[in-house]
Amino acid sequence: MGIEGILEKGFVTTSIDTVVNWSRTGSLWPMTFGLACCAVEMMHAGAARYDLDRFGLLFRPSPRQSDLMIVAGTLVNKMAPALRKVYDQMPEPRWVVSMGSCANGGGYYHYSYSVVRGCDRIVPVDIYVPGCPPTAEALIFGLIQLQKKIRRTNTIAR
């Protein structure tokens, strides 16, 4: 008795959390925060070959319209307040993906005086995508992991 048996009876039973989380995973609207070469791979993931639209991701130009921030590239001290300001402008619930070695922990420029050693010192990060630069496949895998994480959360119980 699959979905056909349920549809014959005319109703489906589920919880509100399941429906809300299902809709959130299918309509993530990322805002790009491209700081260096990782942003090129992020654009590659949104182009025709990989097409993030099929996962429900639609890039938005404004933080007030997005619920996901992808931090891609080297974060320097001068840019850190802008990152926090943009994060604070995003509506709840919001998620952050740290893309690339530089965003994760400073990367190649870790010992430079002007580099923040990981964007998780400025904003809370949900998913880390490793690589220098990470491939489009790695970013897509990270976004799928974020969708799985969203499905596991209890929205109403918060």
Curated annotation (Swiss-Prot):
An example molecular function term from Gene Ontology annotations: 4 iron, 4 sulfur cluster binding
Record keywords: 4Fe-4S, Cell inner membrane, Cell membrane, Iron, Iron-sulfur, Membrane, Metal-binding, NAD, Quinone, Translocase, Transport, Ubiquinone
GO biological process: aerobic respiration; electron transport coupled proton transport
A Pfam family: Oxidored_q6
EC number: 7.1.1.-
Main localization, broad class: membrane
Cofactor: [4Fe-4S] cluster
Comment on bound cofactor: Binds 1 [4Fe-4S] cluster.
Compartments reported by the entry: Cell inner membrane
Segments passing through the bilayer: none
Domain of life, source organism: Bacteria
SUPFAM superfamilies: HydA/Nqo6-like
Entry-linked InterPro entries: NADH_UbQ_OxRdtase-like_20kDa, NADH_UQ_OxRdtase_20Kd_su
Reaction it catalyzes: a quinone + NADH + 5 H(+)(in) = a quinol + NAD(+) + 4 H(+)(out)
Nucleus listed as a keyword: no
Binding site for [4Fe-4S] cluster: C37, C38, C102, C132
Entry GO CC: plasma membrane; respiratory chain complex I
Membrane topology: Peripheral membrane protein
Stated family: Belongs to the complex I 20 kDa subunit family.
Assembly behavior: NDH-1 is composed of 14 different subunits. Subunits NuoB, C, D, E, F, and G constitute the peripheral sector of the complex.
Function per UniProt: NDH-1 shuttles electrons from NADH, via FMN and iron-sulfur (Fe-S) centers, to quinones in the respiratory chain. The immediate electron acceptor for the enzyme in this species is believed to be ubiquinone. Couples the redox reaction to proton translocation (for every two electrons transferred, four hydrogen ions are translocated across the cytoplasmic membrane), and thus conserves the redox energy in a proton gradient.
Protein name as catalogued: NADH-quinone oxidoreductase subunit B
Species whose genome carries this gene: Acidithiobacillus ferrooxidans (strain ATCC 23270 / DSM 14882 / CIP 104768 / NCIMB 8455) (Ferrobacillus ferrooxidans (strain ATCC 23270))
